[in-house]
């Protein structure tokens, strides 16, 4: 059978793209081809088609205008890390923390799976830009998919459509991203609301800068511009070209005097990343302003001024719904007022959405994420724990005025976070770039609130699932960046989750984290006092702004900042990962670890800020 025509619009000039689409049509055998233009009319048409097919449920126009609910197949609710592959030419370049298959072998497997995989479906061609259009840091990709769900989500999450193709001239490079739900339809066969396949592959070819995803419909596996391109492929590109692609939020911090800084922060799962990106300062800290640039990914390069400059490559927010509320993140809730797609949350009788912790008291009746009746106390969640929202970033009430600036934003500080009930203080500053890189490389979180130290999960730079090459080479690349940037960002480590012996959190968190952020900005500009500790530079009690938090005594602060000699156990917990990476581990890491261990051994058994220093100035 002859392949159908690709029907490329006149404004498509890129020869490589035209040839790739022709080859993909011949392989996948779709019934038709649609070149996505990114228009409102196209989005509305696809949403209406999915409502008619049962994939989407239109929410109340009064409660949630122009928004939709989608329920996935129960087997397709999250990223599939065990089916995610880095197919570098050499196995050792993927490293021991990634799954690897030889490229030739993987391509043979994928070729069989993709043969005829789009029969009975429409093939959509989605041109998109990861970053503001025209930015020298932005990168263009093209995703081919047979899922209208992917198209509508990509329109929210990326700058996509005709405007991107008009930037892609005849010889311009782009990253090809191929996706299929893996569920071809025979003539007359009825479709299902959420087509997918049990055989899943999420594959990256770093040398070719190419991505292939098969059989999943879940956003994290199908919105290929996000983790697949902007982190796994982009991190590999960044290593080769001398820049950084990181799993980090970006926020703006403006002082009452009008001094503006930009900060990037890496938070592992369940550490409050989106909440921090949209933090609201306490009312007593009048004049301080926080703006959001992005909540998940940043790309940056060195500027002529010797600093790192960054962009948010995304156009929307793809966030976890449960736990998001007017208490925890009012700015996020305001962002979700309209024009959103919700996946696997619960449906209220009046046509709105609900998820756990959204309100203090759950509704009396819901339809849960699997379409079943739900009432309080029925012993199952109303929303899936990994249920998601996709929302336009432009709707965020504190979006930074320069968030789409193609000239990029200078970064003053990096923050790396963990979730630890003990050992790690509230905040400290690394003494130098190399030490900061080591601390970021060994950052960890407890798997549960009651987990023992042995259950700590080490997640370097919050990049363990997303680094597209050997993690040891990744550490070396970070050290190299520090050697080439004349004015690098200052590096800080935070832990909002330190507890008392009875299990209560010592730090209030949420908006009060602004007090720590203010101290950091003072350190960046050489104004805030600090004390040298076994781990780095720490704030004195009087260095933080305590207005509105009068009950937080210096004694309580001392406990929050203390360092036990048991901290050496934290260093021992790093061994498993570092031994895995030993053949490419930076030599500096061995020396830094020994120096830290020696410092902890020689420190008092229980190190605390000395009270007599509280009033001293550095």
UniProtKB/Swiss-Prot annotation:
Query: A single GO molecular function, which one?
Result: manganese ion binding
The record's subcellular location field reads: Cytoplasm
Top-level taxon of origin? Bacteria
Q: How is the cofactor bound?
A: Binds 1 Mn(2+) ion per subunit.
Binding positions (Mn(2+)): 227, 247, 296
Instruction: Please name the top-level EC class of this enzyme.
Output: lyase
Q: Where does substrate bind?
A: 79, 218-220, 269, 386-388
Q: Which PROSITE patterns match?
A: PEPCK_GTP
**What EC number(s) does the entry state?**
4.1.1.32
Q: Enumerate the catalysed reactions.
A: oxaloacetate + GTP = phosphoenolpyruvate + GDP + CO2
Q: Which residues bind GTP?
A: 270-275, 388, 419, 510-513
**Which UniProt keyword terms apply here?**
Cytoplasm, Decarboxylase, Gluconeogenesis, GTP-binding, Lyase, Manganese, Metal-binding, Nucleotide-binding
Extract one GO cellular component term from the record: cytosol
Q: Which family does it belong to?
A: Belongs to the phosphoenolpyruvate carboxykinase [GTP] family.
- According to its UniProt entry, what is the function of this protein? Catalyzes the conversion of oxaloacetate (OAA) to phosphoenolpyruvate (PEP), the rate-limiting step in the metabolic pathway that produces glucose from lactate and other precursors derived from the citric acid cycle.
| HAMAP family reported in the protein's UniProt record | PEPCK_GTP (MF_00452)
Q: What is the name attached to this protein's record?
A: Phosphoenolpyruvate carboxykinase [GTP]
Species in which this protein is naturally found = Chlorobium limicola
């Amino acid at each position: 059978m002859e392949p159908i025509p690709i029907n490329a619009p006149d404004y498509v000039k890129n020869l490589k793209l035209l040839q790739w689409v022709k080859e993909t049509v011949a392989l996948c055998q779709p019934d038709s081809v649609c070149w996505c233009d990114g228009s409102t009319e196209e989005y509305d048409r696809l949403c209406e088609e999915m409502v008619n097919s049962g994939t989407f449920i239109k929410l109340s126009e009064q409660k949630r205008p122009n928004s939709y609910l989608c329920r996935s197949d129960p087997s397709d609710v999250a990223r599939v890390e065990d089916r995610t592959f880095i197919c570098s030419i050499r196995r050792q370049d993927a490293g021991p923390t990634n799954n690897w298959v030889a490229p030739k072998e993987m391509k043979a497997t994928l070729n069989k799976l993709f043969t005829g995989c789009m029969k009975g479906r429409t093939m959509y061609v989605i041109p998109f830009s990861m970053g503001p259009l025209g930015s020298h840091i932005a990168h263009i990709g093209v995703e081919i998919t047979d899922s209208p769900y992917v198209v509508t989500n990509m329109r929210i999450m990326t700058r996509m459509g005709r405007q991107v193709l008009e930037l892609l001239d005849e010889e311009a490079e782009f990253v090809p991203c191929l996706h299929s739900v893996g569920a071809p339809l025979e003539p007359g066969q009825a479709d299902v609301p959420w087509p997918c396949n049990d055989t899943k592959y999420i594959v990256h070819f770093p040398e070719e800068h190419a991505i292939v995803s098969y059989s999943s419909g879940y956003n994290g596996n199908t919105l290929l511009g996000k983790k697949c391109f902007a982190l796994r492929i982009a991190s590999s590109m960044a290593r080769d070209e001398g820049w950084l692609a990181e799993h980090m939020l970006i926020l703006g911090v403006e002082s009452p005097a009008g001094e503006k800084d930009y900060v990037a922060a890496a938070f592992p799962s369940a550490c409050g990343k989106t909440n921090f990106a949209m933090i609201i300062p306490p009312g007593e800290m009048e004049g301080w302003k926080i703006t959001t640039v992005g909540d998940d990914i940043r790309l940056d390069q060195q500027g002529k001024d010797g600093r790192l400059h960054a962009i948010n490559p995304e156009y929307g927010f793809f966030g976890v719904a449960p736990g998001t509320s007017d208490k925890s993140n009012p700015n996020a809730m305001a962002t979700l007022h309209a024009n959103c797609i919700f996946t696997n949350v619960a449906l209220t009788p009046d046509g709105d959405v609900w998820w756990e912790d959204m309100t203090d008291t759950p509704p009396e009746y819901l339809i849960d994420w699997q379409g079943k009746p739900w009432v309080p106390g029925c012993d199952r969640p109303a929303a899936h724990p990994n249920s998601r929202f996709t929302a336009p970033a432009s709707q965020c009430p504190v979006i930074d005025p320069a968030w789409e600036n193609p000239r990029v934003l200078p970064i003053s500080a990096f923050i790396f976070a963990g979730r630890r009930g003990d050992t790690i203080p509230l905040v400290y500053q690394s003494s130098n770039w190399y030490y900061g890189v080591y601390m970021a490389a060994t950052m960890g979180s407890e798997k549960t609130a009651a987990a023992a130290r042995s259950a700590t999960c080490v997640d370097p730079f919050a990049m363990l699932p997303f680094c597209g090459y050997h993690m040891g080479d990744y550490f070396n690349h970070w050290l190299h960046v520090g050697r080439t940037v004349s004015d690098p960002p200052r590096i800080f480590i935070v832990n909002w989750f330190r507890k008392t012996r009875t299990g209560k959190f010592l730090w209030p968190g949420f908006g009060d984290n602004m007090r720590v952020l203010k101290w950091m900005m003072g350190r960046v500009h050489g104004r805030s006092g600090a004390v040298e500790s076994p781990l780095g530079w720490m704030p004195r009690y009087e260095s933080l702004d305590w207005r509105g938090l009068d009950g937080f005594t210096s004694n309580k602060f001392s406990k929050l900042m203390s360092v036990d000699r048991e901290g050496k156990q934290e260093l021992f917990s790093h061994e498993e990962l570092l031994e895995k990476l030993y053949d490419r581990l930076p030599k500096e890491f061995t020396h830094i670890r020994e120096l830290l261990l020696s410092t902890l051994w020689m420190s008092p058994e229980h190190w605390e800020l000395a009270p007599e220093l509280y009033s001293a100035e550095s």
